[in-house]
Amino acid sequence: MRANADNPEDAELSRGFGAEGIGLCRTEHMFLGDRKQIIQTFILNEDPAVREKAVGELLAAQTGDFLGMFRAMDGLPVIVRLLDPPLHEFLESPRALDVEIAKLEAAGGDKALIAEKRMLMEQIDGMSEANPMLGLRGCRLGIVYPILPVMQVRAIATACAELQKEGLNPKPEIMIPLVSVVAELEKLRKVAEDTIAEVAAEQGVELDIPVGTMIELPRAAVTADEIGAVADFFSFGTNDLTQTTFGFSRDDVEAEFVPQYLAERLLPYNPFATIDPGVAKLVEMGVELGHKGNPDLVCGVCGEHGGDPDSVKTFHTIGLDYVSCSPYRVPLARLAAGQAALAEKMGDGRDK
């Protein structure tokens, strides 16, 4: 039983609830607040020197974040997902900028500032995508902007090395998101391994940091034997796997027609709350194929289904090694996992 946590406070809370590790640490949440301006500078400037300076600032900040996370979970695994969302999520809304420009113009504001805001709006508009959740995000970001995964892996490895020198036992694992073809994982795994080796040499320590991937696209599930051969672990991202299997946009369908589908019994339940049998088949296929590629592959789930008792029982039947959910759902998920294991044991006893 693991938990989803993005900061040391949630990690400590999870540990108190009995979590045996962190199944998902979302690094994009570490880029918000005061750091949002830094990532915006990286995105909006093509000058290599400016980008390099921004990445240096992010490296220092992320190293501090990981020091806190790994210290809080000393001796337990912490799966860190590299940057996943589309970059536009870190930028200002073009609509909000348009309103701001209109207000400045109405008030007779500074023309240079208005021109600057208008140029920024045009730049952000130029980065927009028709379907950003299936566009430039996940591992694709790391391939298009290789400096980003290098920075994040260096921060993870540096934090790990520093804590090892303190006599602690940090256990980070690196997760590469949204892989659809094995070549993506091969490319980014090499980036990670090369960076880890550099940090280990600089720090004079040995670093053993597993590298795995999220299985959240149908193609990844049905080619999991290929992907598993170059992964240390799989984590099934069942939120996105449900979206891409159904062809649903969760943000839209839950408000627009899922209630009607439930009322008319076109769906037996909300598939984003409890795992759908069709999606579960993809998970099962991914586990079976993944183990063909790598018999030692560790498989878990980090979507919201990890905290749903009915889904937990399904995952136990499939043979997953762990589930991960929000800290406050850990006790309920632990109970469901225990009940599933007991039911299986009693069933085995009756069979004998």
Predicted regions and their residues:
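Conserved alpha/beta-domain cores
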Residues: 1-352
